[in-house]
């Protein structure tokens, strides 16, 4: 608007920046702020930040994912961003998939403008369902899951494999009761090629298919990940609980016997009360052999999905577990960091030296590039994606670097959690007033200090681990959470060892 008449002449620097500078997206550089005004930060990852933005010409709100170009240090990373945008364009316009508005590149960043999905995550919706009609049923779960599988079906029909399906990558379009659930993140997605399999380890812990760990896979991995989501929707916990303790800065080569053998627990609560047809569908989706796995189209035709899911309430323990599963990562990461701060030089042995060797510029923190080079020196053959996942796992405060304490907390041996003196020090950190109990306010303060949570998370954590219902967590309850929580490691590691 108003750019055709009366605009000021181009300067020499404009001409250089717009015409001569090599671009990543292959189109002229453009100032996105000519078209959009930026507002609050909506979310942040290690390699990009999503902002609320408003289109100047219409006043309509969108989400904008901005990726600093300095984080795209390799051709592989640049191609990945281009592929993400191409795939979003390719699948845009379909139900249950976020709509892309446009992409821009300036001197500093690449910007992806997309539909704003302001209705919250899956678990938020389930909370709302419980509050609106006092219970959550298999029928509710089937309605939610239908949208997830439909997104997978669309991707596969358009020759796209998502590769990173998880609850966090789905958002509701609005707060309306009938809002549509949409897949929002295609950063790991690739095109399917006839007869070609993929080798690179991608995806997120809990949702990764066994063939990904074995190094040869196809689109069937999306069915596995969706099956894990359904298991969580019906029980509140994932079927294969490989947590943050299994991903340390020494390796990302996880070999988890439980995943590879596909052992499913249908005996513990609430499974005896869940319908046979629901368990039958999960079994079809979490079949070890990819070629025997049910397709997305057939999932949608399964009897449980076609209005046969019971409408009776699921045990309240399921909702309780979901809240725990969502909030536990943050508190346990923070507690591990507190324990790491209290370890002696003797206890951490060679970890300090390893950190110093990786911290090439002696800044006191390890950048992505330093982590990548350090792992290479130790003989690691990790891909760019795998190094990124390590970075995300170890970077507790989400500032894009790993400081010394974060490094120690990610690499220290987990038997430290068995020692009472370490657990007590961590407990004392949260117990600010020395009362012998941790309150919601104390959890909230600790998590806010590290930029790791909000009041809702703190309240959920207190309620889930407060076994005697006094509104506080005592020391015994804290130890139980740390030692026996859902993030207890169950796999083993191969690769580099410290």
From Swiss-Prot:
Q: Provide the protein's localization.
A: Membrane
Kindly state which keywords UniProt assigns to this record, in alphabetical order: ATP-binding, Calcium, Kinase, Lipoprotein, Membrane, Metal-binding, Myristate, Nucleotide-binding, Phosphoprotein, Repeat, Serine/threonine-protein kinase, Transferase
UniProt domain comment: There are 3 contiguous domains conserved in the CDPK subfamily: a kinase domain, an autoinhibitory (junction) domain and a calmodulin-like domain. The autoinhibitory domain (309-339) inactivates kinase activity under calcium-free conditions.
Q: Where does Ca(2+) 2 bind?
A: 395, 397, 399, 401, 406
Q: How is its activity regulated?
A: Activated by calcium. Autophosphorylation may play an important role in the regulation of the kinase activity.
Q: Which GO terms of the cellular component aspect does the record hold? A: membrane
Q: Quick one: which residues bind Ca(2+) 1? A: 359, 361, 363, 365, 370
Disulfide pattern: none
Q: What is its EC number?
A: 2.7.11.1
Domain EF-hand, residue spans: 346-381, 382-417, 418-453, 454-488
* Top-rank lineage group of the source organism: Eukaryota
Instruction: Name the catalytic site residues.
Output: 164 (proton acceptor)
Q: In the UniProt record, what gene is named as encoding this protein?
A: CPK22
Molecular function GO terms recorded:
ATP binding; calcium ion binding; protein serine kinase activity; protein serine/threonine kinase activity
Provide the topology term for how it sits in the membrane.
Lipid-anchor
Domain Protein kinase, first and last residues per copy: 36-305
PTM annotation (Phosphoserine): residues: 204
The name this protein carries in UniProt is: Calcium-dependent protein kinase 22
Renumbered to this chain, region (Autoinhibitory domain) spans 309-339
Q: Which residues form the signal peptide?
A: none
Q: Where does Ca(2+) 3 bind?
A: 431, 433, 435, 437, 442
- Locate the residues binding ATP: 42-50, 65
Q: Which SUPFAM superfamilies match?
A: EF-hand, Protein kinase-like (PK-like)
State where it is primarily located. membrane
Q: Does the keyword Metal-binding apply?
A: yes
Q: Which organism is it from?
A: Arabidopsis thaliana (Mouse-ear cress)
**Enzyme category, top tier:** transferase
């Amino acid at each position: 608007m108003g750019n055709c008449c009366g605009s000021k002449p181009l300067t020499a620097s404009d001409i250089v920046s717009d015409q001569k500078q090599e671009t990543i997206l292959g189109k002229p550089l453009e100032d996105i702020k000519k078209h959009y005004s930026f507002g609050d930060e909506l979310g942040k990852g290690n390699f990009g930040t999503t902002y609320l933005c408003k289109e100047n010409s219409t006043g309509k709100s969108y989400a904008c994912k901005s990726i600093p170009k300095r984080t795209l240090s390799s051709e592989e990373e640049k191609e990945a961003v281009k592929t993400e945008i191409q795939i979003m364009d390719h699948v845009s316009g379909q139900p249950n998939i976020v709509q892309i508005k446009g992409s821009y590149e300036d001197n500093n960043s690449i910007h992806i403008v997309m539909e704003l999905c302001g209705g919250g995550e899956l678990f938020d919706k389930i909370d709302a369902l419980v509050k609106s009609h006092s219970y959550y049923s298999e029928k509710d779960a089937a309605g939610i899951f239908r949208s997830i599988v439909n997104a997978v079906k669309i991707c596969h029909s358009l020759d796209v494999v998502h590769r990173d399906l998880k609850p966090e990558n789905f958002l509701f379009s609005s707060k309306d009761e009938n809002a549509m659930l949409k897949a929002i993140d295609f950063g790991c997605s690739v095109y399917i090629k006839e007869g070609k399999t993929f080798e690179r380890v991608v995806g997120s812990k809990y949702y990764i298919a066994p063939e990904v760990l074995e190094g040869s896979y196809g689109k069937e991995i999306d069915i596995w990940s969706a099956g894990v989501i359904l298991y969580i929707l019906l029980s509140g916990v994932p079927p294969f609980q490989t947590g943050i303790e299994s991903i340390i800065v020494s390796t990302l080569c996880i070999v988890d016997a439980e995943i590879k053998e596909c052992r499913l627990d249908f005996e513990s609560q609430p499974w005896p009360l869940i319908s046979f047809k629901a368990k039958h569908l999960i079994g079809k989706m979490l079949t070890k052999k990819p070629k025997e796995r049910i397709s997305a189209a057939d999932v949608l035709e399964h009897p449980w999905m076609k209005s046969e899911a019971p409408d009776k309430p699921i045990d309240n323990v399921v909702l309780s577990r979901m809240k725990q599963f969502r909030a536990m990562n943050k508190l346990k990461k923070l507690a591990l960091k507190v324990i790491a701060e209290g370890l002696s030089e003797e206890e951490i042995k060679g970890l300090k030296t390893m950190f110093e060797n990786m911290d090439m510029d002696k800044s006191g923190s390890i950048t992505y590039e330093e982590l990548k080079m350090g792992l290479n020196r130790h003989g690691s053959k990790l891909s760019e994606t795998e190094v990124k996942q390590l970075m995300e796992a170890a970077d507790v405060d989400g500032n894009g670097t790993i400081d010394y304490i974060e490094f120690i907390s990610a690499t220290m041996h987990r038997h430290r959690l068995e020692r009472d003196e370490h657990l007590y020090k961590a407990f004392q950190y949260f117990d600010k007033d020395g009362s012998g109990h941790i309150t919601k306010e104390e959890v909230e303060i600790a998590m806010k200090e590290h930029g790791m949570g909000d009041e809702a998370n703190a309240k959920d954590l207190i309620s889930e681990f407060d076994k005697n219902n006094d509104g506080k967590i005592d020391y015994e309850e804290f130890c139980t959470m740390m030692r026996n929580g859902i993030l207890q490691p169950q796999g083993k590691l191969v690769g580099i060892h410290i």
